[in-house]
UniProtKB/Swiss-Prot annotation:
PANTHER family in UniProt: ANKYRIN REPEAT CONTAINING (PTHR24173), ANKYRIN REPEAT DOMAIN-CONTAINING PROTEIN 16 (PTHR24173:SF74)
Chain intervals with Low complexity compositional bias: 426-436, 443-511, 642-658, 694-733
Name the UniProt record assigns to this protein: Ankyrin repeat, bromo and BTB domain-containing protein DDB_G0293800
Entry keyword set: ANK repeat, Bromodomain, Repeat
Compositional bias segments (type: Pro residues): 626-641
A matching Pfam family: Bromodomain
Ranges of residues in domain BTB: 239-307
InterPro entries, sorted: Ankyrin_rpt, Ankyrin_rpt-contain_sf, Bromodomain, Bromodomain-like_sf, Bromodomain_CS, BTB/POZ_dom, NET_dom, NET_sf
Naturally occurring in which organism (per UniProt): Dictyostelium discoideum
UniProt keyword annotation of Ribosomal protein present: no
Biased composition (Basic and acidic residues): 210-228, 666-675
Bromo domain residues: 516-622
Length: 806
């Protein structure tokens, strides 16, 4: 127990150990190596008794991590409502913000802690309209995750539905609404043929006599004759009912009206009985245009005025016809109007449609089927536009918005945390690539050769090291899959010819592929993911990260947009990607999260680097125009100013990451010094042979020589920097590089960051870059002096920037 610190005991809920440590006078505000306080661990774990003990001993209730997260953030992340209550009772700030501008309410929503979020809103009085650094309110976050109960609670407590985030999106723009195929289409009921067949069935149920047949034949002959002579008079002669609306007559037939709309005939039967004469039946409830359209549908199954209109017009007339059909229980007419209105709903008229719908009686609205649903879905999906309309400002209130969300609740799917991610656009990738230093391009003759080798180099230098020995060359063994290596110009001495041929084939294939997620691309992407699942190194990426179960409570402090292979596979299976770019962005996001959160020396970091490199290489081979982005190391974590004691404790530890980083960078490229290369003079040749032997042995030596090499690297770096600066300022001829200077440059290359190593390899003549097995080798003696001068200039610039950053 003596070896257990207070933060450790609080993290694991060791109540008795905490009591013992507090009895010994342990400082309740001591931080661990991650700069988190004991109260953080107790809060996220839900150990309320430990929280109470710490607060009673004077724990800082609003203490924060380097990223600004307080114990209240941690309790909200874990859904620990009791701990939240206790912290707020002890004056915790319910609206405190972390480094990303997130309040505890935002944090609870980011972790899908629905009950906790509702408690913060309704019980603890959290401000529902505060924004994160990305401009998202709690309503944005709840909507993106499909958390209907939280959305309703937010709206009831004053959340604004028209506020926009930094991307100019209103909250409901990202509301996940999913409809099945059966819900998307609704069959129109009671076709004309069905209705007319009912009329014919009446004749089938009676015995036909010859007289009846003759009468029928005579009628048919009369109708045919009359239609041929004068169609206009046929309506009057053979119609048996006439309506008078606004002093205009409409002719009809009782049998057809009875078959098509029985309830309408029932409503006028009294008038027919009272009016034995042939006087027209007066209709006062409807306009002539409306009633004529009603009769038109009864006879033709369509309304000409409907067919000639567009989405932009006022649909009040169509609603009037629909209500008329609903009143007389004419299901076919209701279905016809409903489908027409559904197809006519657009961004410009959805507000006016909703204004009409919400005024309808509840019984009528229930008979509108999917029309109400489709109207609400269109309204929500065009929320950015709708919030700027006059209808929104004049006719929509808080209760309306709540009703909208409740009505859509059955179709809103709660989105898993792992699927919530930041949209990463091509502009962001372009911005990242522009920020990296780009050396002067070579002439067109070398650009051709540079095409394919550059692809190999990129993946090599972004590959994590899975060392099976101390040799740096073995570290890149897993960088290039065996299948893909056969298609690249590896193991070839004639690099130029193989590269140029590959370049031409690449350019021809690039014009034959589409970036849309068609069946061919979907099959390829599924193959990539299934291949990753089979690798043992992918176990850590196959499911979403559980911070509590895995003992990493700060995971969501660092990683705001989680992603995993299981989620990606699910989206592929459900056609969740529209383009290959979206798919690749998710895969890279998953591995970049691992590289950001984990230490360079950890197995997870190395596995992530290996898998990311393999993915980029295979993806690039299949989609030559989809260049992988330039991966930048994450920015350093901001830390508070340490005390004198902390500075003394950290003195010894700060040197370790530096040396580890150097060793890591040394493993990125295996540099080969060719002992058989021709040298300018015999003396230099002898000297080279000796030096090459030592260099060759050092490249495969054990880790015991790393410290000496690093010291030599520093000395050589200084001398080379001085010589290069004096040379550039005093000489006009090309500098000649000695063997020692070439080795010095080689050592300095290995000290660079991975991205800088990539740029160096882009500068070097591709003929000097060779691939042996699955590792890269640079022959320093095949690089001419002019090319070396470019390399040295870039290296000096990199070290200068590193010193400025320090």
């Amino acid at each position: 127990m003596s070896n257990k610190t207070l933060p450790y005991c609080c993290e694991h809920g060791l109540k008795d150990e905490v009591i013992a440590l507090l009895a010994k006078g342990e400082d309740v505000n001591q931080k661990d190596g991650s700069n988190r306080y004991p109260l953080h661990y107790a809060a996220i774990g839900g150990y309320i008794e430990i929280v109470a003990m710490l607060l009673e001993r004077g724990a800082l209730v609003n203490c924060s991590t380097p990223r600004g997260a307080t114990p209240l953030h941690y309790a909200s992340r874990g859904g620990r409502i009791e701990c939240i209550q206790l912290l707020i009772d002890n004056k915790a700030d319910v609206n405190c913000r972390d480094g990303a501008g997130s309040t505890p309410l935002h944090t609870a929503l980011q972790c899908n802690e629905t009950k906790c979020a509702i408690a913060l809103i309704e019980t603890f009085g959290a401000d529902v309209n505060l924004k994160t650094a990305e401009g998202s309110t709690a309503l944005h976050l709840a909507s993106a995750r499909g958390l209907v109960p939280v959305i309703v609670a937010l709206l009831e407590n004053g959340a604004r539905a028209d506020v926009r985030d930094s991307k100019e999106n209103s909250p409901f723009q990202s509301l996940p609404i999913n409809l099945t195929e059966n819900e998307k289409k609704e069959k129109i009921e009671n076709s004309i043929s069905q209705d007319i067949s009912k009329l014919f069935n009446i004749n089938k149920n009676r015995e036909f006599s010859g007289v009846g047949k003759k009468e029928d034949d005579d009628n048919n002959m009369k109708i045919d004759k009359q239609e041929s002579e004068q169609q206009s008079t046929s309506d009057k002669l053979y119609s048996d009912i006439t309506f008078l609306i606004e002093n205009q007559k409409v002719y009809a037939h009782k049998c057809i009206l009875q078959a098509r709309c029985p309830n309408f005939m029932s409503s006028i039967n009294n008038k027919i009985e009272q009016q034995q004469s042939q006087k027209p039946i007066e209709i006062k409830d409807y306009s002539f245009k409306l009633f004529l359209s009603f009769i038109e549908w009864i006879y033709t199954g369509s309304i000409e005025k409907f067919e000639s209109t567009s989405k932009s017009i006022d649909l009040s007339f169509q609603f009037s016809i629909l209500l008329m059909g609903e009143k007389f229980d004419c299901k076919g007419l209701v279905s016809y109007c409903r489908e027409f209105i559904k197809e006519s709903i657009g961004d410009s008229n959805v507000g006016s449609i909703w204004s009409i719908i919400k005024k309808l009686p509840t019984s009528t609205r229930s008979n509108l089927g999917n029309l109400v649903r489709d109207c609400l879905i269109t309204m929500v999906r065009s929320w950015n536009i709708f919030t700027m309309t006059k209808t929104f400002s004049t006719d929509i209130n808080k209760s309306d918005i709540i009703e909208i969300i409740k009505s859509l609740a059955p179709f809103i799917t709660e989105t898993p945390i792992s699927e919530i991610k930041q949209t990463r656009t091509a502009n962001a990738n372009a911005s990242n690539s522009n920020q990296s230093k780009t050396p002067a391009k070579r002439t067109s003759t070398t650009n051709t050769n540079n095409n394919i080798p550059q692809q190999n180099i990129t993946s090599s230098n972004n590959t994590p090291q899975q060392n099976t020995s101390s040799s740096s060359s073995s570290s890149t063994t897993s960088s290039t899959p065996s299948k893909s290596s056969s298609s690249t110009p590896s193991k070839s001495t004639s690099t130029s010819s193989s590269s140029s041929s590959s370049s031409s084939s690449s350019s021809s294939s690039s014009s034959n592929y589409s970036d849309s997620m068609n069946e061919k691309n979907l099959t390829f992407c599924k193959g990539l993911i299934n291949g990753m699942f089979k690798k043992k190194t992918s176990l850590a990426f196959q499911r979403p990260v559980d911070p509590l179960a895995e003992g990493i409570p700060d995971y969501f402090d660092v990683i705001k947009h989680p992603m995993d292979l299981g989620t990606i596979k699910g989206k592929l299976d459900n056609n969740g990607y529209s383009t290959i770019k979206d798919f690749a962005a998710d895969v890279r996001l998953m591995f970049e999260n691992a590289l950001t959160y984990n230490a360079d020396s950890s197995p997870v970091w190395k596995h992530a680097k290996t898998l990311l490199n393999a993915f980029d290489q295979k993806f690039l081979q299949n989609f030559p125009n989809e260049k992988p982005p330039t991966y930048k190391p994450p920015p350093p974590t901001p830390t508070p100013i340490p005390t004198q004691q902390q500075q003394q404790q950290s003195t010894s530890s700060t040197s370790t990451p530096t040396s580890e980083k150097k060793r890591k960078h040394d493993e990125h490229v295996k540099v080969k010094e060719d002992t058989n290369s021709a040298q300018p003079t015999s003396s230099s040749s002898n000297h080279t042979n000796g030096e090459n032997a030592s260099s060759s042995s050092s490249s495969s030596s054990s880790k015991q020589s790393n410290n000496n090499n690093n010291n030599n690297n520093n000395n050589n770096s200084n001398s080379t920097t001085n010589s290069s600066s004096s040379s550039s300022s005093t000489t006009t001829t090309q500098k000649k590089y000695s063997d020692e200077e070439r080795r010095s440059l080689m050592e300095r290359i290995n000290e660079l960051a991975p991205d800088d190593v990539q740029e160096v390899l882009n500068i070097i003549d591709p003929n000097a870059i060779k691939q042996a097995d699955e590792s890269l080798e640079i022959d320093m003696y095949q690089i001419d002096d002019k090319n070396l001068s470019q390399v040295e200039s870039f290296i000096n610039e990199c070290f200068k920037k590193q010193k400025q950053d320090e």
